[in-house]
From Swiss-Prot:
Name of the protein this chain belongs to: Agmatinase
A molecular function (GO) term: manganese ion binding
Known pathway: Amine and polyamine biosynthesis; putrescine biosynthesis via agmatine pathway; putrescine from agmatine: step 1/1
Swiss-Prot/TrEMBL cofactor(s): Mn(2+)
Gene3D superfamilies the UniProt entry points to: Ureohydrolase domain
Catalytic reaction list: agmatine + H2O = urea + putrescine
Amino acid sequence: MQYSTLAGQTDNSLVSNNFGFLRLPLNFMPYESHADWVITGVPYDMAVSGRSGARFGPEAIRRASVNLAWEHRRFPWTFDVRERLNIIDCGDLVFSFGDSRDFVEKMEAHAGKLLSSGKRCLSLGGDHFITLPLLRAHARYFGKLALIHFDAHTDTYDNGSEYDHGTMFYTAPKEGLIDPSRSVQIGIRTEHSKKLPFTVLSAPKVNEDSVEETVRKIKETVGNMPVYLTFDIDCLDPSFAPGTGTPVCGGLSSDRALKILRGLTDLDIVGMDVVEVAPSYDQSDITALAGATIALEMLYLQGAKKD
């Protein structure tokens, strides 16, 4: 197999980084590996409507994850996820920068190849548009999906743009990728259309309700469908995550978001991503740390199924 470099874009997909997520060994042959979960960095931010810079999110998340690597039995879990799951980091997706169509093709192909070889995908963005080609690959493999979506925005806007990080969840139901009536959006605190039957749990409501009540509503909505889990870091209040392109005050605390995530252990989560970390706007790497922690907690959700 031939590997790409940033200087010489080829048809093959991955470029190395200096280190992997959680100090995991880098593996540039993910399709042939025995991994359960494959982490891919997705340095794409050409679909943003506000501040750019999320293309540097994967690097920042990996760097922050080094601070999490030492804790073998992560609190409050009772196990080391690295002993339950075979997790690899395959580096960053390579595509022709400036060419969104090429990005979409490469993202779908990479995820589809991983899924067809028995792996699951955890993707580190990048802006939130990366979720659309990932949903296409997952729906092709698993069928129609339920979506669990943490965000300040519903991303259901119909503005006619083919590449926009605010339109994916308008497009995905139209393409039959997700069932909006079995999907839930958590942390919303911006104006949005109510034409689609998503269950919307606004940030004020989530902050007022108990964690247990929020988890109950999520589980009640998605049922036993295969679930795609996506976490836009701007779901968190800017006091916890300032380093993002479109921050909105009044969001969730990192504590509440993590507790909600930990309640989702018995759902059939088949794909996951963390998006919209833009380190140039960060303070003391707290947004990158939040992104790394959320990504790690997502993996612990999967490890908990091995009990």
